Curated annotation (Swiss-Prot):
It catalyses: 5-deoxy-alpha-D-ribose 1-phosphate = 5-deoxy-D-ribulose 1-phosphate. It comes from Bacillus cereus (strain ATCC 14579 / DSM 31 / CCUG 7414 / JCM 2152 / NBRC 15305 / NCIMB 9373 / NCTC 2599 / NRRL B-3711). One of its GO terms (biological process) is L-methionine salvage from methylthioadenosine. This is 5-deoxyribose 1-phosphate isomerase. The keyword Isomerase applies. Catalyzes the isomerization of 5-deoxy-alpha-D-ribose 1-phosphate to 5-deoxy-D-ribulose 1-phosphate, as part of a 5-deoxyribose salvage pathway that recycles this toxic radical SAM enzyme by-product to mainstream metabolites. The record marks C159 as: Transition state stabilizer. It is an enzyme of class 5 (isomerase). Signal peptide: none annotated.
Length: 347
């Protein structure tokens, strides 16, 4: 088993990120010391995965205000709001981004009686706390998910909701790591996940390094492996869960959920509670990021379609709650009726 890759670290007053755009061929850690550089890292997907984006943005708030010289409370709060508003524009779909930024702004507001120097330190401590909490949340999700799994089962996952998308364990992969600790032998199938291939470049990489049995398949092989009886459960992460249980996740998740429903295979969604957005009634209200055409037709520096091709490249799709068997959170497993039961998590 190789050393686990660490996607997010705080070192020497800087955010240190594993550049995930270079995986699996290069392992490169890069330091970020400004809010602008953090914004860029999120936007170009050097860091990705809803929880990891939220943690990075929280550190980005501190980096954006740490050199701020304004001595008045009002001036400082204006700057905090400005930095939060700016970082919120990096990617629109992952609700953890907005949750983390709102939390940082609230901490500044609640502690406005402190000196400016103390406020800056308080914001850094809050970013570190968000970071610490994420690791514990992931383990709790894994423990709950493991009650739905058994030794020897075949599990399909899509995209990367692993340790590289969070801070440790991952969400959808958390039960895989915990199963390994128990001595179980799960057989994981990882969709490559077009167009950015997070399933093959990230999920397969981290599971392989952890000594977990993982097989890469192309996205259009999912129906085949299900029909062959190789899949006992599907588990995916998510970028946002609406109040009714609709789930926004990486493009292709919807198709996997439809296949799972057809073959009567449980379809589980691993979702930290910060990813659940009760302000969004249904999946129709979730903004879907569209990315550049080059990701589809010029992924590796050579065109795989005519250069002038029209390209539609949504980064996410929405899986209706009817296709979801259960949503697994750190607080427990939620089943239908989702509107009622998701609300109970926050009471």
């Amino acid at each position: 088993m190789e050393e686990q890759l660490i996607p997010i670290q705080w070192k020497d007053d800087a955010l240190v990120l594993l550049d995930q755009t270079l995986l699996p061929n290069e392992i490169v850690y890069e330091s970020f010391k400004t809010a602008e550089s953090v914004w860029d890292a999120i936007q170009v997907m050097k860091v990705r995965g809803a929880p990891a984006i939220g943690v990075s943005a929280a550190y980005g708030v501190y980096l954006g205000i740490k050199e701020f010289a304004e001595s008045t409370e009002e001036g400082f709060m204006d700057e905090v709001r400005k930095v939060c508003t700016y970082l919120a524009t990096s990617r629109p779909t992952a609700v953890n981004l907005f949750w983390a930024l709102e939390r940082m702004e609230s901490v500044a507001t609640d502690n406005i009686h402190l000196s400016i120097s103390q406020l800056k330190n308080r914001l850094l401590e809050e970013a570190k706390e968000i970071h610490r909490e994420d690791e514990e949340i992931n383990r709790q999700i894994g423990e709950h998910a493991l009650t739905l799994f058994h030794d020897g089962m075949g599990v399909l996952t899509h995209c990367n909701a692993g340790a590289l998308a969070t801070t440790k364990y991952g969400t959808a992969t958390a039960p895989m790591y915990l199963a390994k600790e128990k001595g179980w032998d799960l057989k994981i199938y990882s969709d490559e996940t077009r167009p950015r291939l997070q399933g093959s470049t990230l999920t397969a990489l981290e599971l392989q390094r952890a000594g977990i049995d993982v097989t890469v398949i192309t996205d259009n092989m999912a129906a085949m492996v299900m029909s062959q009886g190789k899949i006992d459960a599907v588990i995916v992460g998510c970028d946002r869960v609406a109040a009714n249980g609709d789930v926004a996740n990486k493009i292709g998740t919807l198709g996997v959920s439809i296949l799972a429903k057809y073959y009567n295979i449980p379809f589980y969604v691993a979702a930290p509670t910060p990813t659940i957005d009760l302000k969004t009634s249904t999946g129709k209200e979730i903004p879907i990021e569209e990315r550049d055409a080059s990701e589809v037709i010029n992924r590796f520096g050579k065109y795989s379609a005519p250069k002038e091709s029209k390209v539609y490249n949504p980064a996410f799709d929405v899986t209706p709650h009817e296709n979801v068997t259960a949503i697994i959170t750190e607080k427990g497993i939620v089943k239908a009726p989702f509107t009622e039961n998701l609300k109970k998590l926050f009471q």
